[in-house]
Every structure is written in C-alpha cells, then in structure tokens.
C-alpha cells in the first residue's frame, strides 16, 4: 500500500538515495513542503509544494516525480491530492502547477482529469543553467500554467 507523508529531516538521507530532491534547499528555508510517496519503507515518488514566490501567487505543485517502474498506477494523482489537501488545510482556495507546453502529454492528461485548467497566462519560457542542490542543471522548456479551485 502506498502512503504519502511530508518529508521529515530524518528521512532526507534515505529518500535522497532513491529520488532526486532537487528543491530540498527551499524546504529547509520553510518556503515549501516535500511530499514523499512510500511503498512500505521504500520511497517511490515525490512532489514539491512551493508556498511563496510562485508565478500565480497561489501554492504551486512542482517537481512531481514517480520512479519509472511505478508510473501509471495512480501515484502522481495521490501526490497531487495530498498537495491539494495540504493547501486547503493552510486556508488556500486554489492551487497551481506547470507542465511542459510541448511535452509530457501523459502529465497534461492526468492534470486535466484531476480538474486543472489553463490559468489564462502566457506560457513561461525557461532556459539556461540553474543551480539545483549545488549542481548546474540545464533547462530549455516552455511551461504552461494550470490552476484548480479547491
């Protein structure tokens, strides 16, 4: 059975061996929350919720990642639901996320099924080198922002 919990400081080393915790520094600064999906003691997926500094000014689900062998089993939907519940618990009435405008058709289909709609803003082009956990990472993509009322 898969369960979703907030990433706790004591779990970081264990989870980091299996999943790319790209935005861990933001959680440490208390501007975000990592959710981790577990199958028994094994971390199999995560999602990041940014609470401040987001493009639409509402919480933003970012960096949803499910290990390849566990995809298409509802785990991303479970993580998204947990993020929505956390946003509701904090008093928010909507939540957002972004997805590649030209790629990741499966993710766009999932988010539409879960009730996310185009936020009505122009896609945002991201390109260049950014630092993630002390390492450079090259990005080149256009992001489509989606939003869902809670």
Region locations from a protein language model:
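Conserved acetyl-CoA-binding loop of GNAT-fold acetyltransferases
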Residues: 111-121
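Terminal substrate-recognition subdomain of acyl/acetyltransferases
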Residues: 124-150
């Amino acid at each position: 059975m898969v369960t979703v919990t907030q990433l706790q400081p004591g779990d970081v080393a264990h989870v980091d061996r299996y999943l790319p915790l790209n935005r861990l520094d933001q959680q440490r600064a208390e501007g975000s929350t990592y959710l981790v999906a577990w199958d028994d003691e094994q971390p199999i997926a995560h999602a990041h919720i940014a609470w401040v500094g987001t493009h639409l000014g509402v919480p933003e689900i970012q960096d949803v990642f499910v290990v390849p062998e566990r995809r298409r089993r509802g785990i991303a939907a479970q993580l998204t639901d947990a993020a929505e519940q956390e946003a509701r618990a904090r008093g928010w009435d909507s939540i957002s996320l972004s997805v590649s405008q030209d790629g990741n058709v499966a993710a766009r289909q999932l988010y539409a099924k879960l009730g996310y709609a185009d936020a009505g803003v122009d896609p945002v082009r991201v390109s260049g080198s950014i630092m993630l956990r002390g390492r450079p990472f090259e990005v080149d993509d256009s992001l489509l922002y989606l939003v869902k009322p809670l």
